[in-house]
Amino acid sequence: QAMINKIEQEAQLTAEKKAKDVLVTTIQRLAPEVTSDITVTTVSLPSDEMKGRIIGREGRNIRTLETLTGVDIIIDDTPEAVVISCFDPVRKEIAKESLERLISDGRIHPARIEEVVQKVTHEIQNKIYEEGERALFDLGIHNMNTDGVRALGRLYFRTSYGQNVLTHSKEVAMAASLIAAEIGVDRELAKRAAILHDIGKGAENDSDQNHAEVGAEMARKMGEDA
């Protein structure tokens, strides 16, 4: 009987280790390295006459808008539309919102463009922080520093494979918490690591590193155990 009990215990330990290995491998496979992101957005115009006003005399208006927002504005033969192109989703959103307000207002000149971009930038930065705070509150995660909150909030404006990255990160955090409970490891730590797993996708600066490496570096600078 003692031998049978020993064999059963060893079998159980082996099964638990195998289950943990399977779960870890599965999670890794569900975190692809390549980010497929939408880098362009279209702004509708009331008429094609608006294209000339957006360009401005000697191109001053469009140059001002591109310089202030860091995007490329493409004006071609597409009827009643212009295209905004930028890899940074926050810059793209600021440019889109600014251009839509300028078109609606009708006053389009360098001084007005600067005024609108400044206002929209302030609003978007506030939105970033609010979305980061909301995500952490929903998950019950505490003591994240300001940089961490903002890094998460930037993901609100990012999509990857057709999904909002902040929503995806929250879902991963909830799944990680449940899995951690099942395999007997720290749920809070798992949840915290999971919510941060994609922050590299929202990095403000372009990098040759993949998003996981960028995110790990960001987490270390934020004081997280990466």
Short names for language-model regions:
Residues Q1-L30, V34, A95, I113, ...:
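Long, amphipathic coiled-coil
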Residues N5-I7, L13, K17, T35-P46, ...:
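Interdomain boundary/hinge elements
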Residues R29-L45, G106, H142-L155, D186-A193:
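Flexible hinge/switch segments at interdomain interfaces of large molecular machines
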Residues G52, D77-R91:
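Short glycine/threonine-rich beta-strand-turn micro-motifs
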Residues G52-E66:
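Short amphipathic alpha-helix segments
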Residues F87-T146:
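OB-fold/S1-family RNA-binding modules
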Residues E130-M174, A180-D186:
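Pre-Walker A segment
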Residues Y156, T167-E171, A176-A226:
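Divalent metal-dependent catalytic cores for phosphoryl transfer on phosphate-bearing substrates
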